[in-house]
Amino acid sequence: MSVHKTAILSAVISALFTSGAGQAAEALTAVGDGEGQLDIVAWPGYIERGESDKAYDWVTGFEQETGCKVNVKTAATSDEMVSLMTKGGYDLVTASGDASLRLIAGKRVQPIDPTLIPNWKTLDPRLKDGPWYTVENITYGTPYQWGPNVLMYNTNVFKTPPVSWSVVFEPQDLPDGKPNKGRVQAYDGPIYIADAALYLKTAKPELNIVDPYQLTETQYKAVLDLLRAQQPLVHRYWHDATVQMSDVKNEGVAASSSWGYMVNGLVADKQPVASTIPQEGATGWADTTMLHAEAKHPNCAYKWMNWSLQPKVQGDVAAWFGSLPVVPEACKGNELLGAEGCETNGFDLFDKIAFWKTPQAEGGKYVPYSRWTQDYIAIMGGR
């Protein structure tokens, strides 16, 4: 799915969002001296200062250059990010598409001025004006990284890459002759409903699913039925990267949705693991650095947004996280990422990814995210 061509929102929702655009009046007109501090909510592994590996540090140089000391609060899910931003006390958040529109609608983030970010001109054209951070032609953040939700698998179990997501959704024996029950994982977040919908788009074409984030009642019921049938198969609903890596190493997990971050970490640890994007395609995420509506350190925030778009920073983040840079130039000449890093992580798969976005009712045509949340919690609980 090519998300930049997707219709953004219904007229009703657009009107709601536009009402929140008044915050732009208080936005910076020029970037001045930093306030000395910057507080960021981020995914684990997104803001590294060399503590995990000395080679991966894109914070120390920023602090030395700007005088802005960076404090990071990690969040394991988009729902946690929305909760933290609602409580306040942070300047920036690295929001995925299933959080960004909620933050905009809830007036928790403010518009930014791309003309105050010199490196904006280096952005990948495919990401400019993405509907997950642009509403009514107003820009609500700076792209940071993107990537697919891959199918991770144990190479001792699968001698060739699995061709379908059915290995995690449908009861079956895996290639080693043993059942998949208790050996697969699913993501611990309502947005995973879209993964099931994407699978059924191919597996049950009679449902006529076009967009896995826009499900009619009939389509939605079929997706929930699939997820309820999957529940007894699931070893764990994962959201913590470290826990999933441990499960793969120690608990016999043979297949799961995952991120490049975990796959790369397990491969580096000499584990028999690889990843693939099956025939049905994959969901994915395009993360945006968004500015809190009441940010206390806006100058440091703008300095960070510009810093984050440097090719070296983008390439280093992509190498560490197993993601893809939003600046194409970052794919070249990065020692950590390597010459084939962008290709390996899926740089050319953009149009095959159904990027996360917040499901909207659009006048009652589709099932909204609030229902996704209620129903997925029930499914994970076995109801």
What are these regions (language model features)?
Residues 122, 221-230, 269-293:
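Periplasmic-binding protein-like
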Residues 91-95, 237, 254-259, 274-275:
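Paired acidic/hydrophobic, glycine-rich loop segments that form the ligand-binding mouth/hinge
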Residues 292-356:
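Mature extracytoplasmic/periplasmic domains
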Residues 99-102, 256-272:
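A ligand-binding cleft/hinge motif common to bilobed small-molecule-binding domains
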Residues 48-54, 94, 99-243:
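Extracytoplasmic ligand-binding site segments that recognize negatively charged/polar headgroups
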Residues 25-103:
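Early extracytoplasmic/lumenal segment of secretory-pathway proteins
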